[in-house]
């Protein structure tokens, strides 16, 4: 299990050796945006030049072997809705996504699916044997609302088996930087039915540092995934803010990166 950095023509992305499908966790490198959005910004609602975002998006779609209007994407609301998508859900770039969903599942070949992040946990899942994939935006609210449980349920409805699912979680804000009040660890405790050993660092000032990726790895194991089939990036988006977009570091003045996967 490992993440490797790939550079294709200047576009830098991360890939998990565990995921048996074409996929990418993008970084800030390899786009055309300028100023505070330099350079690979995929957020279309942050104030960046729309034509720059469009070109950035085209480059990421090309990584997935697709055209700019050939992917299905999330419209994220920090909820637990997971949508099963088909070719009818292909998104016309820069248009409004007509549904709300923080996770996407498909069994259609040649249909890339994509979610967007800037500190939240990006999760890509794949059952290669049964040809089912998922892309999930796991912010803390989506996580504790059990979006991964919804994802695995939708994948299994398409024929996937938990023991065959491989999952990778890309760069996200780490326990080193994810400072929270009591509401977050309390919600995580409930989410995981108390299986939270090693997930929190409680500080003297009353704040708690939370390892959200590790928490979601616990949930995936509870859902039947094998521990050896779960990969976790060691990178923190806030610590590595020059490489990744971080909402907390920039206080909201930032772009977005993507996690994308496709069945070839």
Where are these regions (language model features)?
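Active-site microenvironment for binding and transforming phosphate-containing groups
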Residues: 1-264
């Amino acid at each position: 299990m490992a993440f490797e950095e790939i550079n294709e023509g200047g576009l830098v992305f991360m890939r998990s050796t565990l995921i048996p499908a074409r996929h990418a966790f993008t970084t800030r490198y390899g786009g055309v945006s300028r100023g505070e959005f330099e350079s690979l910004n995929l957020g279309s609602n942050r104030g960046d030049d729309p034509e720059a975002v469009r070109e950035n998006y085209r480059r990421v779609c090309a990584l997935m072997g697709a055209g700019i209007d050939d992917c299905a994407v999330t419209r994220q609301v920090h909820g637990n809705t997971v949508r099963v998508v088909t070719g009818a859900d292909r998104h016309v770039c820069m248009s409004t996504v007509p549904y709300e969903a923080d996770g996407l599942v498909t069994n259609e070949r040649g249909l890339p699916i994509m979610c967007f992040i800037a500190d939240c946990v990006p999760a890509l899942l794949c059952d290669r044997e049964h040809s089912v994939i998922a892309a999930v935006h796991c912010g803390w609210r989506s996580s504790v609302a059990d979006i991964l449980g919804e994802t695995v349920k939708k994948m299994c409805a398409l024929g996937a088996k938990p023991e065959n699912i491989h999952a990778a979680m890309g760069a996200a804000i780490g326990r080193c930087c994810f400072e929270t009040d009591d509401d977050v660890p309390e919600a995580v405790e409930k989410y995981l039915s108390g299986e939270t050993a090693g997930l929190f660092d409680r500080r003297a000032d009353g704040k708690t540092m939370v390892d959200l990726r590790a928490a979601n790895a616990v949930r995936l194991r509870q859902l039947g995934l094998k521990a050896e089939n779960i990969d976790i990036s060691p990178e923190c988006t806030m610590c590595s803010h020059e490489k990744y977009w971080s909402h907390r570091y920039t206080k909201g003045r930032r772009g977005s990166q993507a996690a994308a996967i496709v069945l070839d």
